Amino acid sequence: LAPVAFLDGDPAMPRTYVFIVGESANRNHLSLYGYKRNTTPKLEAMRDELVVFEDVISPDTHTIPSLRKVLLFSELQKGDTILTSPSVLTLLNSAGFTTYWISNQAVNVEGATGVRLFAEDAKQVSFLNMARDEGRSVSYDSVLLPELEKILGNSVERKAIFIHLMGSHLTYAL
């Protein structure tokens, strides 16, 4: 894959992009998007530094098909392009970024292989939840923060950080 040229200025300029893969997140419950309860105060405080997408939907109801479509630029109505298209991470690597994948998803459960396939396109991968039963895993997404802070604090100038949340995957019991 040939290097991707920057279209927006000096390619030597330091840049950091953070992509949140928000499992089971519903924007209707995020105050950043107008929800009446104060659920995202830290994001709201830095709103001017963010690119907040207002009109985005998940292309599927399950993680792997959604990631295939989003990370491979697949069109909603067309077939899978996993064997023919480079992923977003591959393109970012080609553009000179150091890519990171930080996940709170359980890596040792059935179905985790599909997520790992995308994660392995990153130059550095960290799966922090080693549970064997995702339904019983109580691993809050805050466990990702120390790893994120470490990456943000390193000397790499051009970073693309993918953060894969556990979100609302926890088992609920009365």
Language model segments and positions:
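Active-site-proximal alpha/beta segments of enzymes that process anionic O-linked groups
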Residues: L1-F19, S24-L174
